[in-house]
Amino acid sequence: MQKNEPLRFLNPKSCAEIAKKFGTPCFVYSEEGIRASAGETLKFPNAFGLTVRYAMKASPNATILKIFDSMGLHIDASSGYEVHRALKAGIKPEKICLSSQELPEDFAVLYQKGVKINACSLDQLKRLARAFPGQSVGLRFNPGMGSGGTGKTNVGGPSSSFGIWHQKIPEVKEILKKSKMTAQRVHTHIGSGSDPKVWQRVAHMSLDLVQQFPKITTLNLGGGYKVGRMASELSTNLQTVALPIKAAFENLATNTGRRIHLEIEPGTFLLANNASLLCRVQDLTDTGEEGHTFIKLNTGMTEVLRPSLYAAQHPIVIVNQANITKNYIVVGHCCESGDLLTPDYGNAEKLLPRNLNKTEIGDLCVIEGVGAYCASMSCKNYNSFPEVAEVLLPVTGETRIIRRRQTLEQIIQNEV
């Protein structure tokens, strides 16, 4: 049984005010929290310099990109479209690095603008070599192992297609030699919500990869640092996980004279607990004495897909003054039995009741921990529900809209 959890940065008064001004459902981001998390990553222990790249797939809103840019963070993009989105937000091309499953058709234009590109397969490397012989390139490797919060967020090892398999270094060297290209960066990323010990082990393996290429100056160790959304879940301590790796960089410099620059690319760590989804209880139903009592919200997998996809756990708070609690199953508004917001741990098809404030139809509700991989990774427009509004709770000033609520006309505007 999951216990009731508190609100993070909202309170009953602010919830009511935001709902009145912007409607529900809507995502609410805390600028103060975002800046605090970014500050933590900028203190990541390093030996010879650090670049923090925001994995913008976590939440690509232009306002969020601009906040991170103002703090000196760079951008990790996962598609050509994300690159263009970052450019439109005012991010300088030289601060953007693309590591993509699909090399965009206009990759040459992006490269010429100054966008850094990591080859994520041998074919991508060949295409880059043909387009830019004698130039520099980054190499994303699959180091042979991975780790993620679930199998679906593990992007390393033999079951993952991400990156060049680590045993294909001879082929990589041959392509570089023929094209006279220089490998300037090595990149590895093993998954989201990864085990810190596995991350450390892969970091050492990545340094071994660096030694295979004499011109490498930068090693990007990816992100994936675990963030506890529920009170019972632990978060990665960046200082603890990074200090041994700093020492490994220093040892490499002592033994070889090579002072390697470190990059990391967090997404979840920067945003997960810095946004809340404000919604309403729109219906209550039950399945008798042997069944369950269900809360139906005016949101669901159209905004928060992670519980349905990963059996991920998110705190849910009924915003009322009730002094008694009750066990509920919380579901979304989609015509889909999988639109479940309270799955069991590790099993998206099994129901796990939550002990929440006793609620009535019309009560406000807050789903916490939705800053990363929610607004950006949802079943957009399923059942023709429009994209919801996103608002920012700034450090100073009034809460303001950063993405307008979509209309039905906007949903159908491209139909012919």
Regions from the PLM with identified roles:
Residues 1-135, 173-182, 211, 353-355, ...:
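A charged N-terminal "starter" segment
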Residues 49-53, 72-74, 93-97, 114-116, ...:
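Structural preference for beta-strand elements that scaffold enzyme active sites
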Residues 10-13, 29-36, 59, 123, ...:
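Conserved active-site and cofactor/substrate-binding residues in soluble primary-metabolism enzymes
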Residues 34, 57, 79, 110, ...:
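Conserved, mostly hydrophobic/aromatic
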Residues 58-60, 81, 102-104, 121-123, ...:
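Active-site-proximal loop/turn and secondary-structure-junction residues that shape catalytic pockets
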Residues 259-416:
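Charged (often Lys/Glu-rich) extended helix/loop segments that serve as interaction or gating elements
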Residues 55, 99, 120, 140, ...:
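Generic beta-strand/beta-sheet core signal
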Residues 131, 143-285, 385:
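Active-site loop/helix belt of alpha/beta enzymes
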